[in-house]
Structure formats: C-alpha cells, structure tokens
Amino acid sequence: MSEREQRIRIAVVDDHEMFRAGVIATLQPYFDVVGQAADVEGSVAMIAQTKPDVVLLDVHVPGGENGGGAEILTKSRAYSPNTVFLALSVSDSPQDVGSVIRAGAQGYVCLLY
C-alpha cells in the first residue's frame, strides 16, 4: 500500500464501553482503529504505545488527577507529538470546551441527544 493509500490510524478514549464499541464499529471499515481506553492512565499508555494519527477523546474520563481529557492530552503530547486530538462530549459547558481546547485539542464535537 502506498503512503497515499495508508489508512488513518485512530484511537478512541471514552469511559463508556458501549459508546466506544459503537464508534469503533462505525469507523473500522474506513480507518485503522489502533487502540481504545477508558481512563486517564490507560489512555496515556495506549497513546504512547500506538502513536495514533487521531485520538477521539471524551472530555470526562476517570482517573489520573481528575483532569479528564485535558489531562490525557497534556500527558500524551510528549509521547506522541504528531497526534491530532478531537474531543467528543455530551457536554456543551464552556469550561469543558475550553479545558480541552487550551490543552491542545484540534476541535470539539458536542454529542447532543
């Protein structure tokens, strides 16, 4: 496969297993899903190991120092500096949006039901 034909490598971070499974099932035909995690520590380790092109990142993730997605982003940068982070959340709180954008997320998608 040529470099131009290489599929984008994606990781999914969310503490809800069913949501992760749905996102992964939807993306797998089009992207290489290289990892998934449910908490801060597991996410940082997975990102350091897999170095994905893109991380789809929940804002509210347990563990760590209670920093959630912003903490994952900050801690992962040293291990995977070229990874693009896109936050996904049901929260439209300005504090939540601001925390991950300030930490370096490239975008924020609000999942309203």
PLM region spans:
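Non-catalytic signal-transmission and effector/linker regions of two-component phosphorelay proteins
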Residues: 1-9
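Acidic, metal-coordinating helix/loop segments flanking the phosphotransfer/catalytic sites
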Residues: 38-54
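Short amphipathic alpha-helix used as the core "switch/output" element in two-component signaling
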Residues: 45, 66-82
